[in-house]
């Protein structure tokens, strides 16, 4: 899932995918609005100083496809959330320049320090349109309680 040995492309959509996506498109504005509500709530209510959240320029409107935070130790945070029945994920734990598929380009660890830092510290919080208010509140409460005792 996270490790790529070769560069690949797949531009084909199968008929079933097209049918599902065609039906789903009518819900996109509603889903986007809900994702934005949840994302803005996270931004406002998660106040733990160990958690850094992405900030967006005022002239932009984020959709919150993912809600990515950075923490000092992403494995510890993911474990903590899992112990409290909240699933979080790492996204792209290996930066592109260190993937086997790009080994021929000669990049080494340290060549892209920002990408490497983010790969080691990013966590994606749950955020999906169907989240209930109690689930959202639980994520917020757990984030705020993380390593604060």
Identify the meaning behind each predicted range.
Residues 1-149:
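PLP-dependent aminotransferase class I/II
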């Amino acid at each position: 899932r996270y490790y790529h040995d070769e560069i690949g492309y797949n531009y084909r959509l199968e008929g079933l995918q097209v049918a599902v996506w065609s039906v789903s498109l009518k819900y996109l504005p509603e889903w986007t609005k809900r994702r934005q509500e949840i994302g803005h709530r996270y931004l406002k209510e998660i106040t733990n100083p160990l958690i850094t959240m992405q900030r967006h320029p005022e002239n932009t409107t984020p959709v919150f496809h993912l809600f990515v935070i950075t923490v000092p130790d992403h494995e510890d945070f993911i474990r903590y959330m899992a112990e409290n029945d909240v699933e979080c994920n790492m996204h792209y734990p290996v930066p592109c320049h260190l993937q086997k598929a790009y080994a021929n380009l000669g990049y080494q660890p340290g060549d892209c320090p920002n990408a490497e830092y983010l790969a080691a510290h990013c966590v994606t919080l749950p955020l999906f349109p169907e989240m209930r208010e109690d689930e959202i509140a639980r994520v917020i409460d757990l984030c705020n309680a993380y390593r604060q005792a």
